[in-house]
């Protein structure tokens, strides 16, 4: 699978079947077109594809590993970073993060990642769009399982990320 194929495939189908009630077709198309414009230039590697705190193992106060590899695949390298960071927003309720607080988390995660391997300029510029695409994926998924509340929550996270785009690119 590739994120781009998913966006154009089952995600589009789910949103179309829902008659674009949660996210507008124009917002979806704008995001897909942007993703498509750089997708083939982004480095690919084996990714976990479900990185969140529930899949982390801790021992003696530190990270000791992670579990749940059933979604692992070869995909864009920045997917796991973006998924983890959007997951922080999704796990919070009642706007627990201000925009500035969340951007500090973004900076910290990217800095930690880059302490091991640097991201390219193209990858850094793609991060907001990949995050927005992940939220569109969740909108489509929650629609497909008839969970309108969580689909709307994902849409709200999508807009939160849109409002942070320039700050994310400057990390």
What are these language model-derived features?
Residues 1, 115-118, 122:
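Conserved ATP-binding subdomain of kinase catalytic cores across diverse folds
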Residues 1-37:
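Active-site catalytic-loop/activation-segment of kinase and kinase-like phosphoryl-transfer enzymes
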Residues 29-32, 103-110, 158-165:
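Hydrophobic core segments within long, regular secondary-structure runs in both alpha-
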Residues 32-79:
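Active-site acidic catalytic loop and adjacent metal/ATP-binding pocket
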Residues 119-131:
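All-alpha amphipathic helical-bundle segments outside canonical DNA-binding/catalytic cores
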Residues 138-171:
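ATP/Mg2+ or Mg2+-diphosphate-binding catalytic cores
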